[in-house]
Amino acid sequence: MFSFDLSERRSGRYEGVNGIFTCPVPTTSTKREEMKTSLRGSAETLLPSGPQITMVSSSTTVDASGLSYGGNTLLGLGADRDPERSAKLGGNKSQESERSAENAQTVKRNPQVTERPDSEQQPQIYPWMTKLHMNHESEGKRSRTSYTRYQTLELEKEFHFNRYLSRRRRIEIAHNLCLNERQIKIWFQNRRMKWKKDSKIKVKE
C-alpha cells in the first residue's frame, strides 16, 4: 500500500506484527529490489518456520499443534509443557470413572434398597383401628364350653353325691368324660353357685 505525502515523495506503509510503521520508497529499480530483499529477510527473521497463530492484541504466539486456555490443557501443548499436571488430571479422571462404575455396581447388586416393596408402601393398620368392628368380648376371654347331654348327666350325678371334688376324683371324671381338669372345676363352681341361690330362695319362701 502506497501513499503520497506533502513533499511529493512516495512512502510505503508496512504493517508489522506488533504495530504499523512507514518507510520511504526509493525511486530507482535497484533500490526497490534491495528494499524488497531486505524486507523479505526481516520478515523471515520475525516469523520463524512452522505453523503459528499470531495474536496482535496480546503479543503472544501459540503453536498450532496445541492451544492453552486459562491454564487448562485443550489439545496437547499443555501436556508437553507440564507433564505432572496432565498426569494428575488423568489420574483424577480415572478415579472418577472407577467411582462411578462402583456406584453402578452397588445399585445393581442392591435393588431392594432403592425400590421399596409393596408392603411398606401400604399404610400400616393398627389394632385400635379395627377394634370397633370386633366383638365386644374382652381380649383373652376363652370361648364358652358346651357340654353334651351325657356329660351333663354324669356331672349332675357326681354333684348330687359330692359338692366338692378332690383333685384325684376331678382328674378321673375329666378322663372319663373327655374333658380337662379346668372344665370340671369350673362346672362344679357354677353348679354350687346355682345350688346356693336356689337354697336361699327356698328358705325365703
Swiss-Prot record:
Function text: Sequence-specific transcription factor which is part of a developmental regulatory system that provides cells with specific positional identities on the anterior-posterior axis.
Originating species: Takifugu rubripes
Protein biosynthesis listed as a keyword: no
Official protein name in the record: Homeobox protein Hox-C5a
Record bears the keyword Metal-binding: no
Comp. bias regions, Polar residues: 102-113
High-level lineage: Eukaryota, Metazoa, Chordata, Craniata, Vertebrata
Subcellular location: Nucleus
Annotated DNA-binding residue span(s): 140-199
